[in-house]
Amino acid sequence: MSYSCGLPNLSCRTSCSSRPCVPPSCHGCTLPGACNIPANVSNCNWFCEGSFNGSEKETMQFLNDRLASYLEKVRQLERDNAELENLIRERSQQQEPLVCASYQSYFKTIEELQQKILCTKSENARLVVQIDNAKLASDDFRTKYETELSLRQLVESDINGLRRILDELTLCRSDLEAQVESLKEELLCLKQNHEQEVNTLRCQLGGRLNVEVDAAPAVDLNQVLNETRSQYEALVETNRREVEQWFATQTEELNKQVVSSSEQLQSYQVEIIELRRTVNALEIELQAQHNLRDSLENTLTESEARYSSQLSQVQRLITNVESQLAEIRSDLERQNQEYQVLLDVRARLECEINTYRSLLESEDCKLPSNPCAITNACDKSTGPCISNPCGPRARCGPCNTFGY
């Protein structure tokens, strides 16, 4: 906010410079508008000629108007300054608690989110460890299953080989039984043929000859055949018993192996079913944990995006407030400088008023015609007058109030 003091022209006019006695300091006067008033013109003329030239009333009226305008501007600036201070105080009281509260809530929310993130990370690590353990267990069970499957295949191949051997032995037994039956039939046929031939010979030779021969007794063929038959039957029976005993032993062993293999196979099948159920349950749990992790990651991403946008908004708000505060500070500094300038102007005006008041009080005195008489009159307070009447004003008492 800028203020214009409404002063007269700030530059020195030619009204001073047109006088032959005006010093160079008049062109660089420090008081705004000091060279524009008739009093300053009469000052130059007064120091040179020692008279008022009849413009005291006009000068006093002009000075009074200037003083009133300056005082009004000073009061206006003081009121504006007070209003600005109240406005700044109200804004600071309104905004500071809001910013602090919002920061505290954001910090609490960020800490809660960080705790949730840490808990989620630990839970994910625990689930990863459980998944790794389940994978190792499933690999172990898979290895056991493959081993037992290879053992089962070996046992099944052995059973198939024993079944082939059993079939061969069964065929062998049937062949031997068929051979025994054929031998029995052949033996029976031989017996019948032999009996028929013996009977035929007996019939032919029974009534014709009666020859007695002193020789060794004849061999009984029936007895020989019976002995041979009994020997063959005993041999066949022995072979049959041995084959049956061996077959029974092998069959019993195979049955035991088949029973044990079937029991192991059933136990393996039950274990495989349980392992499949466990693997399915672990896969379902793994998929659920993956979904939970994805949802948590999405939630975390959304929360980070939301809170980052909120933080950016808060940062922008803080930046705006800081820029406003900087502008307000700069305005306050500028107004303070203007206020100091106005105070200086006021002090100089008061000094000038006091000077003119002293001049008005001493206007009844007779002024001498000597140009330096007035300076000799005020020599009591300021010292001796200088030899140059048109020198710088700082050497004269009444003009020393301008601070030159």
Swiss-Prot record:
GO biological process: epithelial cell differentiation; intermediate filament organization
Region feature (Head): 1-56
Pfam families tied to this protein: Filament (PF00038)
Site, as annotated: Stutter: A305
Protein species of origin: Pan troglodytes (Chimpanzee)
GO cellular component: cytoskeleton; intermediate filament
Residue span of region Tail: 364-404
Region feature (Coil 2): 220-363
Keyword Coiled coil: yes
Keywords of this entry: Coiled coil, Intermediate filament, Keratin
Region (Coil 1B): 103-203
UniProt protein name: Keratin, type I cuticular Ha3-I
GO molecular function list: structural molecule activity
Family annotation (InterPro entries): IF_conserved (IPR018039), IF_rod_dom (IPR039008), Keratin_I (IPR002957)
Family that this chain belongs to: Belongs to the intermediate filament family.
Chain residue ranges for the region called Coil 1A: 57-91
Region (Linker 1): 92-102
UniProt-listed SUPFAM superfamilies: Intermediate filament protein, coiled coil region
Miscellaneous section: There are two types of hair/microfibrillar keratin, I (acidic) and II (neutral to basic).
Region called Linker 12, residue ranges: 204-219
Domain IF rod: residue ranges: 56-367
